[in-house]
A protein has these predicted regions:
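Short glycine-dipeptide loop
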Residues: 113-114, 185-190
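Conserved alpha-helix/loop element of class I SAM-dependent methyltransferases that forms part
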Residues: 69-90, 106
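A short acidic, Gly/Pro-enriched loop at the edge of an enzyme's catalytic core
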Residues: 148-160
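C-terminal alpha-helical "lid/dimerization" subdomain adjacent to the S-adenosyl-L-methionine
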Residues: 48, 175, 192-253
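A short glycine-rich, Lys/Arg-flanked "PGG" loop and its adjoining helix->strand segment in the class I
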Residues: 175-187
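A short SAM/SAH-binding and catalytic strip from SAM-dependent methyltransferases
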Residues: 158-172
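N-terminal, positively charged/glycine-rich alpha-helical extensions of SAM-dependent methyltransferases
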Residues: 17-62
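Class I SAM-dependent methyltransferase SAM/SAH-binding core
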Residues: 92-149
Length: 270
């Protein structure tokens, strides 16, 4: 547990982890507000079973299970992210929301000397779980923060990653999250989004998996029926660097390059 203390994470007490408290942070390890952000109602109402409940991490923090949920595509999608980054992360990298599985440790292994990987999540229990997967000397910082209201300065990161977060958010929150991601990435930096996509009509999971998601993840249907472009901020200028589809179109990786804010009246490039 020593590495958890070094990141300012509350250690486990008995069988259950502490959900909503942090110890005072150690300097340069974790940026934590005196008052933690409140957990959004939609997260409590629809995702308590996957992220909020103390037992959630014990159930879902299993590599094979994460891979099963993504129909065997977890490693493939993680590999695509790392390959897009050239397995090299200089400067500051922001991962917006924790993820089950080994994605973050693999990202941490790619951080260049002098660089840093910073991860935000609104749930302390998820940050605690992530801390337990990272080496004590990993060049990381953890922040308890709302993805729709980041407290970072403008243009403070070289790149940001959204890995299967957008489909879990209502449209208004999704749009604010994307706007915040663009705000904190510097001009010339990139935003990479990995998530569901509208599947090919020949993909049988289009007809089978959507009803399952409707029951378990009520906002996911948006990404099955619309492109991410529908929620991108209209006041930001960016270009598409790369777009890949996987597994009969059901998953996507979209990489966008952030440009200078466009003058009023000038159309944004897409």
């Amino acid at each position: 547990q020593a590495h958890q203390y070094s990141k300012g994470i509350v250690p486990k007490v008995g069988a259950l982890p502490m959900k909503n408290r942090f110890e005072p942070p150690v300097a340069a390890c974790v940026a934590v507000k005196k008052a933690l952000p409140s957990v959004p109602h939609y997260l409590q109402a629809h995702y308590w079973w996957a992220y909020v409940h103390p037992r959630a991490v014990h159930v879902f923090e299993r590599q094979w299970l994460v891979n099963l949920i993504l129909w065997g595509n977890y490693k493939r999608l993680c590999n695509a992210v790392l390959q897009a980054y050239g397995n090299h992360l200089p400067g500051r990298t922001l991962q917006i929301a924790c993820a089950y599985g080994d994605l973050t440790p693999r990202l941490a292994a790619c951080v260049a000397p002098g660089g840093a990987l910073e991860i935000i999540d609104i749930l302390p229990i998820q940050l605690e779980n992530l801390a337990g997967k990272l080496a004590a000397a990993a060049p990381i910082k953890l922040h308890c923060m709302d993805s729709a209201a980041l407290t970072f300065a403008d243009a403070s990161f070289d790149r940001a990653l959204l890995f299967f977060l957008l489909h879990e958010q209502p449209q208004a929150v999704r749009e604010r999250t994307l706007a915040e991601a663009f705000r904190v990435v510097r001009p010339g930096g990139t935003l990479t989004i990995v998530d569901y996509a509208p599947p090919s009509r020949f993909n049988p999971l289009r007809y089978f998996w959507t009803p399952v998601l409707d029951r378990l993840e009520p906002f996911a249907r948006d990404l099955f029926s619309e492109e991410i472009a529908a929620w991108l901020p209209k006041d930001r200028n960016f270009s598409r660097v790369d777009e890949q589809r996987f597994f009969g179109g059901m998953y996507q990786m979209l990489t966008l390059k952030v440009a200078e804010a466009r003058p009023i009246g000038k159309p944004a490039s897409r």
